[in-house]
């Protein structure tokens, strides 16, 4: 975790390891989105190894569908937690989602993108988000 300070354990009741887990979980969001967009086919070329092989009998389409559902649920968990953290301030949703899913994101970078709040409020919302996320995963 590059220069990311964990939450205050007294205030939020989660350890630095729980925070680290939530932080790392959210950073996987772009990977999930990319995989969800690219893995749509079960057709693969056979691998010729010269070794005899057995067919597993598994259903590749069902396996892919299950994996895609799992990825979508993980993404939905992050998105729902961001929605809950921002509350009535819906304009903050896209900025907080981008912030928590981008490694190395800073408030200064978000300010250049036009974030509609000030630093103190944003970091308070971010801390609340990580608190909620740590409780959900």
Enumerate the predicted regions with their spans.
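Residue-level detector of well-ordered alpha-helical segments, enriched
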Residues: 21, 28, 91-95, 125
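DNA major-groove recognition helices of helix-turn-helix
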Residues: 122-136
């Amino acid at each position: 975790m590059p220069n990311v300070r964990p939450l205050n354990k007294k205030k939020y009741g989660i350890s630095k390891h729980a925070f680290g887990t939530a932080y790392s979980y959210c950073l996987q969001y772009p990977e999930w989105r990319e995989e969800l967009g690219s893995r749509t086919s079960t057709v693969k070329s056979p691998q010729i190894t010269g070794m005899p092989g057995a067919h597993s009998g598994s259903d590749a389409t069902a396996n892919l569908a299950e994996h895609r559902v799992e990825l979508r649920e993980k993404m939905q968990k992050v998105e729902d937690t961001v929605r809950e953290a921002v509350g009535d301030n819906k304009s903050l949703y896209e900025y907080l989602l981008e912030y928590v899913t981008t490694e190395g994101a800073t408030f200064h970078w978000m300010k250049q993108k036009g974030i509609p709040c000030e630093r103190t409020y944003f970091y308070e919302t971010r801390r609340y988000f990580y608190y909620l996320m740590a409780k959900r995963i």
